Amino acid sequence: MLRPSLLSLHEAPVIQPVPEHERVVLAVDLPALGLRAGDIGCVVHVHPGGAGYEVEFCTLTGETIAVASVIASQVRPVTAQEMPSARRLVG
């Protein structure tokens, strides 16, 4: 197995943490919570260094469906070129 050198670790791009209260898009399914990739949530807590987040997912009427602990790679910021859509909750 190849291991990255210390030099390559330092050359890796720095990803800026998403600040609290920003909207994010879920990048993976979280079936245990009934969440799907593409669901939109709000960051309610940023773990040290932006390694992970607590993200609240709500219905369009504001009812909280889940608060998920995710690592940074499981979410991404929303972009200006995206439009949300609605889906029926299962269960």
Locate the predicted segments by residue.
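Basic/aromatic-rich interaction segments and small domains that mediate binding to polyanionic partners
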Residues: 2-86
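Extended, low-polarity transmembrane helix blocks
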Residues: 90-91
